[in-house]
Each structure stands twice: as C-alpha cells, then as structure tokens.
Amino acid sequence: MRRILPLALVLLLAGAGPAPAQPALQTADLGRCRLESGAVIQDCRIGYRTAGTLNATRSNAVLVPTWFSGTSGALVGQLGPEGLVDTTRYFAVLVDALGNGVSSSPSTSARPDSTFPVFSVRDMVATQHRLLTEHLGLDSLHAVVGLSMGGMQAFAWMTRHPSFMDKVVSITGTPRLTPQDRLLWRAELRAFRATDPNGTRAAMKAVSAIHGLHLHTPEHLATMDSTDFRDFVAQREEHILAFDPHDWAWQIKAMLRHDVTAPFGGSLSRAAAAVEADALVVTVTQDHMVNPRPARRFARAMDAERLALDTPCGHLGTGCKADTVRTTVAHFLRDDP
C-alpha cells in the first residue's frame, strides 16, 4: 500500500535536510485597502514572516506569496539551502494572501459572512506591494516565487509592477483562467451554496470531493487501493474542513476574476510585452486543476525560461518532481543579487 501524503507535504518543495526554524508571524496594519472594485477593506492587515538576512544593498529579498488556502507558516518548508528559496543567500518574505484566514479575510472581520468585500488576485499583489514599501522599506525585490495561486500572484506581479523585481518564478500558476478552470471553481462555489446556503463546515465535504478529484489525474487515482482511497478522502476533508468556508469561497472568487491581460484589452501578447523581469514558468502537462496552456503561451510570448513536468501526479506534480523543480529554480535565482 502506498502512503498518501497530506497536501501540504506533497505541494511543498522542501529539501531532505532538517526543517528550518519557524520564523515568527508578524502583522502589518495597512489601514484602508481600496480594492479594484472600489470597495474598501477597513483595518486591513497582512500577515507575513521573514527569514534570512537582508544584505547591505537591500538587493536579495525574495517574496513568496501563499497558494490557495495556504499560510505563510506552511511556506517555511520551502526555505533553506536544500529548499526552494535558500535563506543563506536570500532574505525571504513569506506573505499571507488576502482571504487566507491570517491576513484580512471574511473570518477575521467584525462580520465574518458574505458582507466582506470581494477582492482580486491583483488586490492581493497591491497589499503585498504596500507591505514591502511602507513597512519593510523595500523599493525592489530580487525575485517573486509563487506556487499555484501563488503562481497566479507571480503573473500579476509581472504586469502590475514590472520593474519592481529582477526575476519572477511562477510554478503551476496561470496568467488567466481557462473555461475548464472556471468550471472547476464555479462547481465548488455552487456545491458550497447548494449544500448549505449558510456556508457551514458540513457543506465543505461536497467541495472536498470536487477539489480532490481535480488535484490528481485519473491515472494517479486509479493506482490507489481501498485503504489509500480512504486515507486520501480523509486527508482532503481534514485539510478543507480546517479552513473557514467563507475564506475558501472568497479566495475562489479572487481566482475567478484573475486575468492579467484585462488591463491590456485582453491581449496576451500586449501583457507579455509589458513584463520587464526575467521569468521562469513551471507547468505540469497533466494539471487538471490549473490548465497549463495559458502559462505556456505567456511564457513563449515573453521568451521566458520554461520547465514542463510530465507526471500523473497532476497539480501536485511539482511535489512528485521536487528535485527537478528545486534545481531549476535555484539555478534561475542564483545570479548574484
């Protein structure tokens, strides 16, 4: 029987060495955060952690935003000499995206319900830019490195603040959603609402089944025996039920609005032409959760470095090919900051 690893362990690209010490969670108070929609998040707060040492020229900072439903605490596993971001070389800023239950979210507001303002991926990036410039005193980054929804934020960084960083790495992210992606996220929202309009945690079990179905490929799921499958379902439900239902829904709404080509009239080529940073785009050919085609097209349009992984692990293929991804990212980042 194969051991089914929890999502956090599979998705992380941590090295085989000892786990790095957990840096303290910090909070930046941004006051009012005006969103693209015109709505405002009052008492806007962003959670973050830092690791490593900022060099004398302040040129070695690397921003790592969270993936969907992830936290900065979970990102710590990517740090260290054998991790995705080597904190003996870089000053890592791990940032909690809006809606993850640490930064401003429906669950952290005075009224944790559907009255919380709807935000976008670009709004996530806007709050991160304010964190860096207003609270950490950084006017540039060496790199932005993001996985999954973090990879979507990486694409948004490329076009919203094209000259702010030297390098960008998007891993299983996308510049805009395909119809397949939209069907998935809309199905989760509708299952959530249809099962229980009030959004209780019990409704999340229906969401868990849809989510788990798309994390892997049919080929991968077919290799599970009955015990593997029970463990897989139990671990998926444990992960999802631990997350606030409204936070889950609001981050989905942000992804459904994600399209970095929108400010460029929907033109992918115009959006790609605006990118100034060097870029590395990592995709999984058999990703059923984030369709890799837009990322590949965008990468070709901006002549970015590309790594395509062919693995039945699907969206979690970066975990199954962790050594390849770590080596490629480390080499890409290694230019002296």
Residue ranges and their predicted role:
Residues 45, 49-110:
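N-terminal cap/lid subdomain of alpha/beta-hydrolase-fold enzymes
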Residues 122-142:
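Conserved acidic catalytic loop of the alpha/beta-hydrolase fold
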Residues 139-179:
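Conserved hydrolase catalytic core segment
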Residues 164-239:
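Alpha/beta-hydrolase-fold enzymes
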Residues 275, 281-283:
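Short beta-strand/loop motif that positions the catalytic acidic residue
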Residues 288-294:
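Conserved alpha/beta-hydrolase "acid-adjacent" motif
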Residues 292, 299-314:
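Catalytic histidine neighborhood in serine/cysteine hydrolases
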Residues 312-323:
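Catalytic histidine-centered segment of alpha/beta-hydrolase-like enzymes
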